[in-house]
Amino acid sequence: MDYRDAGVDIQAGRDFVNRIKALVQQTTRSEVLGGLGGFGGCFQLPEGYRQPVLVSGADGVGTKLKIAQALNQHHTIGIDLVAMCVNDVLTCGAEPLFFLDYLATGHLEPEALTDVIAGIAQGCQQAGCALLGGETAEMPGFYPVGEYDLAGFCVGIVEKAEMLNGSQVRMGDRAIGLASSGVHSNGYSLVRKIVDEFIGPAAREQSEAGATEALVSPWSITPWAEREDLPPVDRQQSLGAALLTPTQIYVKPVLAAQRSGLTLHGMAHITGGGLPENLPRCLGEGQSVQLDPQSWPAPPIFDWIASTGSVPTAAMFDTFNMGIGFVLIVPPDEVESALRWFNTQQCPAYGIGEVVAGAGEVLGLPG
């Protein structure tokens, strides 16, 4: 008996590393020292910093993985993984330098897992950081067939004097919301429960009544087919495709805006807990934010979730990003220039509120 008899194929692991080397190489930066395969990844700090501060972040993509696995579509979930980490690091004003991933599965499926790594590499390219290394763990008996889990780790850098920590935020500063691409990577346990309870049974009934075989999968429905206010491409999008839309990565447009002269007093990544939980994290003591929820459009997926699952509006805002994936706090006299900048960078931006006196709350939301 050997390790392979126990369910761990060492040669398959070696072959997998060789498959992904070219993907990793596409993300390299000049500061990377050495290649893939060492015991540790080495990275030389960029020059020009007087008091460099390293900023770290770790995250996953939650049960969005279940949808990717159900649809056998693995090429974008890696982008989500990178986005969740680099957007967090960005809120401190830091430039992401490098990224590491942890991928665990019961059995190595080379095609699917190569797609996952390709997505991670694409996310790193979007963020401008190097995929410095990672770990692929084959653990037979630990995960069901076809399932895997992901975790990501990112390190960024910022000048100490330029680090954002809430102390720069002033009363009267304005909140600028950067549009999300959809649900991003939070709230999927609620989404899956809604699909299981309300859409799955209906799809099965239609299939049993002689409808197309595709309707066996609730992810194939097109909830927006009758929405004449939407472009044709959106009306034709399936539920599964909408839910697998990758999380927006805000690193390059935000850092470029900052380097072009925009003053940023604070930033918030809108993840689990939505605006009410995440926006106060970038404020100072005695501050709240007054928002106008009518000042930005929400992607149609949120209307569908709310109506199909009878989810109260307050609960929607407490769970999802509701169309705003990242928030910037800027001085009032820079709002217009900031909006112009982001809207010319294919990063839709909206003036959504103002910093007011308070106890760390988000005011103005329904409920």
From Swiss-Prot:
Q: What is any one of the record's Gene Ontology cellular component terms?
A: cytosol
Q: Name one GO biological process term.
A: 'de novo' IMP biosynthetic process
The listed locations are: Cytoplasm
Q: Where is the signal peptide?
A: none
Question: Mostly located where?
Answer: cytoplasm
Give, as one word, the top-level EC class.
ligase
Name the Gene3D superfamilies for this protein.
PurM-like C-terminal domain, PurM-like, N-terminal domain
Its EC number(s)? 6.3.3.1
Pfam families, per the entry: AIRS, AIRS_C
- Write out the entry's keywords from A to Z: ATP-binding, Cytoplasm, Ligase, Nucleotide-binding, Purine biosynthesis
Pathway named in the protein's UniProt entry: Purine metabolism; IMP biosynthesis via de novo pathway; 5-amino-1-(5-phospho-D-ribosyl)imidazole from N(2)-formyl-N(1)-(5-phospho-D-ribosyl)glycinamide: step 2/2
Q: According to the lineage, what is the superkingdom?
A: Bacteria
Please give the Gene Ontology molecular function terms for this protein: ATP binding; phosphoribosylamine-glycine ligase activity; phosphoribosylformylglycinamidine cyclo-ligase activity
Family listed: Belongs to the AIR synthase family.
**What's the protein here called?**
Phosphoribosylformylglycinamidine cyclo-ligase
Tell me the name of the encoding gene: purM
